[in-house]
């Protein structure tokens, strides 16, 4: 096997999950020679704006995909929730490995439970999806935008006027943070996760058969089926980070997939949600799209996309 070059964002989390995935590949073939090439993306350069206000898709992947096209790298290890639902021609998701905790982690000063936060408490999040769901359930809380890596956000919780922050559990787990810092993990009844949250997507060139054969050995088809339902919903709804959209699928031992899709208005006042069960992940994503659009969810997306 030739020497492989992996493309990764420069963030601590991106580099950590890239190294962890490389370790999985080397467990299969210890003779593999793999190096990481760090790539700066547009999303990494935007530190003073809310991503939902920047517009566009693929803020954290476009530059990495260009490196794939130019043969500067052989594969890219993405957080799947950052990957637009349509993959460019010539590239493919070569594998979806095991999924980390897909839920959101709630971390509060003095570990005050979410349902006990006083009125007007400030909850920090970088996500419209999280903000809308929190406001729907707890309308007297305030949502305040927060950016930065995990360390930065935890520091802001301690030093600024935030009473709590919410971030993806998967990032905390991959970075080795102990459960002790988490006040609670928010299940899907409290907060429906982002599409693909907790999953990685390993992207490579569609014609790289040698690499695709290697990647197939660390592919998890059950996870792939679940994220296919989620990403089908994202595609059909024309969702992006400008839209409070969530979706989460699980697969049972008998092959049945349960998928819940969610669209909300940013203020949390409008909510469209539906759950379906079946065995065809694409059909499930399409069915939830159809139901939510019939209920009027497309009006929210249309209005938000027109604002950009």
UniProtKB/Swiss-Prot annotation:
Q: Which gene encodes it?
A: hemC
Task: Please give the residue positions where the record annotates the modification S-(dipyrrolylmethanemethyl)cysteine.
Answer: 241
Write down the chemical reaction(s) this protein catalyses. 4 porphobilinogen + H2O = hydroxymethylbilane + 4 NH4(+)
Keyword Transferase (UniProt): yes
Return the cofactor note field.
Binds 1 dipyrromethane group covalently.
Q: Pfam families, from UniProt?
A: Porphobil_deam (PF01379), Porphobil_deamC (PF03900)
Q: How does it assemble?
A: Monomer.
Q: Which family does it belong to?
A: Belongs to the HMBS family.
Entries under InterPro entries matching the protein = HemC (IPR000860), Porphobilin_deaminase_cofac_BS (IPR022419), Porphobilin_deaminase_N (IPR022417), Porphobilinogen_deaminase_C (IPR022418), Porphobilinogen_deaminase_C_sf (IPR036803)
| Further information | The porphobilinogen subunits are added to the dipyrromethane group.
The enzyme's E.C. designation: 2.5.1.61
Protein name listed in UniProt: Porphobilinogen deaminase
**What is the enzyme's main class?**
transferase
Task: Select a single GO molecular function from the record's annotations and give it.
Answer: hydroxymethylbilane synthase activity
Highest taxon of source? Bacteria
Task: Pull one GO CC term from this UniProt entry.
Answer: cytoplasm
Q: Which cofactors, by name?
A: dipyrromethane
Q: Give the record's GO biological process terms.
A: protoporphyrinogen IX biosynthetic process
Q: Is the keyword Transferase in the record?
A: yes
Q: Which organism is it from?
A: Staphylococcus saprophyticus subsp. saprophyticus (strain ATCC 15305 / DSM 20229 / NCIMB 8711 / NCTC 7292 / S-41)
Database matches in PANTHER family:
PORPHOBILINOGEN DEAMINASE
State its role.
Tetrapolymerization of the monopyrrole PBG into the hydroxymethylbilane pre-uroporphyrinogen in several discrete steps.
């Amino acid at each position: 096997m030739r020497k492989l070059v992996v493309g990764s964002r420069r963030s601590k989390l991106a580099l950590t999950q890239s190294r962890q995935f490389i370790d999985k590949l080397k467990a299969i073939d210890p003779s593999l020679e793999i190096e990481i090439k760090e790539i700066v993306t547009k999303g990494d350069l935007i530190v003073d704006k809310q991503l939902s206000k920047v517009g566009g898709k693929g803020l954290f992947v476009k530059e990495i995909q260009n490196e794939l096209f130019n043969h500067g790298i052989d594969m890219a290890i993405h957080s799947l929730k950052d990957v637009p639902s349509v993959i460019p021609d010539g590239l493919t998701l070569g594998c979806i490995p095991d999924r980390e905790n897909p839920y959101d982690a709630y971390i509060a000063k003095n570990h005050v439970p979410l349902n006990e936060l006083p009125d007007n408490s400030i909850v920090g999040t970088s996500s419209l999806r999280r903000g809308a769901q929190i406001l729907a359930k707890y309308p007297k809380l305030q949502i305040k935008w927060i950016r930065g890596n995990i360390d930065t956000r935890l520091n802001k919780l301690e030093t600024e006027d935030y009473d709590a922050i919410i971030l993806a559990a998967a990032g905390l787990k991959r970075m080795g943070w102990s459960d002790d810092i988490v006040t609670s993990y928010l299940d899907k009844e409290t907060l429906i996760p982002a599409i693909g949250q907790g999953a990685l997507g390993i992207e490579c060139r569609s014609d790289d058969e040698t690499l695709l054969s290697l990647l197939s050995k660390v592919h998890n088809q059950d996870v792939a089926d679940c994220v296919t339902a989620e990403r089908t919903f994202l595609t059909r709804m024309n969702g992006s980070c400008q839209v409070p959209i969530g979706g989460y699928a699980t697969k049972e031992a008998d092959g049945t997939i349960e998928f819940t899709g969610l669209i909300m208005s940013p203020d949390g006042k409008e909510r469209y949600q539906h759950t379906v069960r079946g065995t065809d992940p694409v059909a499930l994503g399409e069915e939830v799209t159809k139901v939510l659009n019939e209920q009027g969810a497309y009006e929210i997306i249309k209005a938000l996309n027109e604002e950009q």
